[in-house]
Amino acid sequence: MGQSVLRAVFFLVLGLLGHSHGGFPNTISIGGLFMRNTVQEHSAFRFAVQLYNTNQNTTEKPFHLNYHVDHLDSSNSFSVTNAFCSQFSRGVYAIFGFYDQMSMNTLTSFCGALHTSFVTPSFPTDADVQFVIQMRPALKGAILSLLGYYKWEKFVYLYDTERGFSILQAIMEAAVQNNWQVTARSVGNIKDIQEFRRIIEEMDRRQEKRYLIDCEVERINTILEQVVILGKHSRGYHYMLANLGFTDIVLERVMHGGANITGFQIVNNENPMVQQFIQRWVRLDEREFPEAKNAPLKYTSALTHDAILVIAEAFRYLRRQRVDVSRRGSAGDCLANPAVPWSQGIDIERALKMVQVQGMTGNIQFDTYGRRTNYTIDVYEMKVSGSRKAGYWNEYERFVPFSDQQISNDSSSSENRTIVVTTILESPYVMYKKNHEQLEGNERYEGYCVDLAYEIAKHVRIKYKLSIVGDGKYGARDPETKIWNGMVGELVYGRADIAVAPLTITLVREEVIDFSKPFMSLGISIMIKKPQKSKPGVFSFLDPLAYEIWMCIVFAYIGVSVVLFLVSRFSPYEWHLEDNNEEPRDPQSPPDPPNEFGIFNSLWFSLGAFMQQGCDISPRSLSGRIVGGVWWFFTLIIISSYTANLAAFLTVERMVSPIESAEDLAKQTEIAYGTLDSGSTKEFFRRSKIAVYEKMWSYMKSAEPSVFTKTTADGVARVRKSKGKFAFLLESTMNEYIEQRKPCDTMKVGGNLDSKGYGVATPKGSALRTPVNLAVLKLSEQGILDKLKNKWWYDKGECGAKDSGSKDKTSALSLSNVAGVFYILVGGLGLAMMVALIEFCYKSRAESKRMKLTKNTQNFKPAPATNTQNYATYREGYNVYGTESVKI
């Protein structure tokens, strides 16, 4: 009872102090209901009230605005009820606030039951509710108009369930009428960011390139962030953002990809009222007005400002009409059963709906259901060149594009602007000139790709500017973030128009950019440090034939000699028959042997034939001549083959390479090997399903220290410093070029691991794609591409032509090449002298014994038993230096 009395006294005093003599209050109390994520809107609400109260024009300010603010938790129905009742119990005349799908029904029910007007910038409701003034215009008509203008027949519709199903229903009805293919997905309840990514990837597999995103700004930013990460913002994609705050959305990263982005804007930044408000807004104290100074003005904050204008204008109208809006009765009890509505609430609602003012969001009018009407929405378009106003939409004219800036999916004309050509510093493709510091623009560079870009620009008739890629990478997509780096990233994100560089054509790159026909064919190759030239051995003259062949020749020599000896013994035609009628010989001369091919003469004959010198004896029998003939044929083939290989082995210094192929690399552990950290070579091994390459990739990704290098120059330097313990895998063209550069200590080994090509790249859907492709084909047919390669690879080589050693001159033989021959000669001479000495000693001893025996025989003079005479025999068939009984 006491509390009721105190409450009555309070309102009586408030009525006496707050009302003028005409019954209209001097102070209008309004309520404010804000959620946690409406910090800037709260600041805009208080600042708009402050602007009104500080207006010096008393005609415009016949009363003072006062506000009471409550914060509500929309997920808690008790919190929503308590917040509304708190406002109602304070005797507010109208409530400004926000709602979502969970709190909307509660708030609108209270407003309808208690006749309390609720002015909101939240999304428009589908139902026809009373006492709800909707500051935000509906987008349904504008969206349908643009879908028809762009002639979208297949697209994805991502919508937030909190915003209602009116747009979804309208789109589905239009899809049935126009035979559209619409894939609708609700994203309102998604909390996991990865789920957005999965949806986009699924749509991309369906070849979807057009998206209509109907969400609040925060959720749109989240979705677009995933679009950028997945690289789905390149040319060819089109995103329509069903939101009234196009300039509130973070589009910097998206615009660089080249995708076309269309959106709606309710705040006209060229409006003097907007400009004046922003000038004051940015000067506010951040501590008193959070998110005012250092944050851009949201369109919901502009709607909040306009809501205060509407409330103020409505009460001005009521004051002019002398409408009594005083609070009476049980106005402070919102939970009374039955509910007791405020009798003056209908007058206030009617006044609010009758308001027509110009605000920051344009013309503000309402229909009988409190919805915005007769409004204009600007249509914006974002491309690589930036955002621009493409047209406008209203209820009467529908979408009206600006005639001088017709909307198009094509890139802007390249004839009247300078094309940005991204490239990479890589010899011999692009290099700084020695005096580049004194030069400017494209004149600072030289190389194969510099000349190629000049030729292409000449054929396409464009002006261009060479731009070195900032991170020094060719282009790969990060497995985690899905962001492209290098030159591919420059094209994908719209920072360049063409890439003229040693950029390999691959499948993953072709998905996000376009390539011309290859201007150079190549493959992955192995670079190693050139091994030291092997010094020839003393017996290097034996190298033309394997040691197994030499052993076989020795055995063949011995075998032929033995066979010749045996054949000569068995054949009667090799024996000399004795003739007793012949004239008597000189007793002092030895007789001819009956067979010339004893074992030693057979060996001598075979050796003479093998050395192609011959001897003074030859076989007389047919069998012996057959043996000699096949031996001569054998020696002819062997000596000819030996002579043919001898020149190559003695004049060419061989280098023994420890690695000859990728298989050799994979099955050893002493020599490390790696690739460029970001490029097609690394991607080739990562994606390969061949066992050898899978094994190599497994080693490379787990090797410590890392075998991946940031640049090709780093990889080459590592090869040169590793003393043969590191192999670098790179494109064959680069490998061949470096092999021709000083200090000439690297070499390519083995064949190419794959076959691919370099191409000129352009963004997806670029208008330059076809002209550039035709230019490359024309340069190839004219032979200019071959001339450029010869110019930069071989004409400017520093190590001589690759085959110059065999074609231009023959290396002079050194002593080490033929030292073994001299050793054999010296050894043979020494052996001959030693044998001669032995023969001399043996003969001297034999002669001494013979002379002594002869002397003794002469002293005794025994009668000879037979007619015989002793002769020393030197001929084959007798004991050397022995005596034989020869008949006289």
Curated annotation (Swiss-Prot):
Places the protein is found: Cell membrane; Postsynaptic cell membrane; Postsynaptic density membrane
UniProt keyword Lipoprotein present: yes
Reactions catalysed: Ca(2+)(in) = Ca(2+)(out)
GO molecular function, one term: AMPA glutamate receptor activity
Binding-site list for L-glutamate: P502, T504, R509, S680, T681, E731
Cited InterPro entries: ANF_lig-bd_rcpt, Glu/Gly-bd, Iono_Glu_rcpt_met, Ionotropic_Glu_rcpt, Iontro_rcpt_C, Peripla_BP_I
GO CC, one annotated term: postsynaptic density membrane
CDD domains reported in the protein's UniProt record: PBP1_iGluR_AMPA_GluR3, PBP2_iGluR_AMPA
Cystine connections: C85-C334, C744-C799
Its membrane topology: Multi-pass membrane protein
Signal peptide: 1-22
Transmembrane segment boundaries: 547-567, 622-642, 818-838
All ranges on the Extracellular side of the membrane: 23-546, 643-817
Non-traversing membrane segments, not crossing the membrane: 597-612, 613-615
Keyword list, A-Z: Cell membrane, Disulfide bond, Glycoprotein, Ion channel, Ion transport, Ligand-gated ion channel, Lipoprotein, Membrane, Palmitate, Phosphoprotein, Postsynaptic cell membrane, Receptor, Signal, Synapse, Transmembrane, Transmembrane helix, Transport
Lipid attachment in record (S-palmitoyl cysteine): C615, C841
Record bears the keyword Ion transport: yes
Modification Phosphotyrosine, positions: Y871, Y881
SMART domains the record matches: Lig_chan-Glu_bd, PBPe
Ranges per topology, Cytoplasmic: 568-596, 616-621, 839-888
Self-association state and partner proteins as the record states: Homotetramer or heterotetramer of pore-forming glutamate receptor subunits. Tetramers may be formed by the dimerization of dimers. Interacts with PICK1, GRIP1 and GRIP2. Found in a complex with GRIA1, GRIA2, GRIA4, CNIH2, CNIH3, CACNG2, CACNG3, CACNG4, CACNG5, CACNG7 and CACNG8. Interacts with CACNG5. Found in a complex with GRIA1, GRIA2, GRIA4, DLG4, CACNG8 and CNIH2.
Family label: Belongs to the glutamate-gated ion channel (TC 1.A.10.1) family. GRIA3 subfamily.
Record's miscellaneous remark: The postsynaptic actions of Glu are mediated by a variety of receptors that are named according to their selective agonists. This receptor binds AMPA (quisqualate) > glutamate > kainate.
The protein's role, per its UniProt record: Ionotropic glutamate receptor that functions as a ligand-gated cation channel, gated by L-glutamate and glutamatergic agonists such as alpha-amino-3-hydroxy-5-methyl-4-isoxazolepropionic acid (AMPA), quisqualic acid, and kainic acid. L-glutamate acts as an excitatory neurotransmitter at many synapses in the central nervous system and plays an important role in fast excitatory synaptic transmission by inducing long-term potentiation.
Protein's recorded name: Glutamate receptor 3
Upper classification of the organism: Eukaryota, Metazoa, Chordata, Craniata, Vertebrata
Gene expressing this chain: Gria3
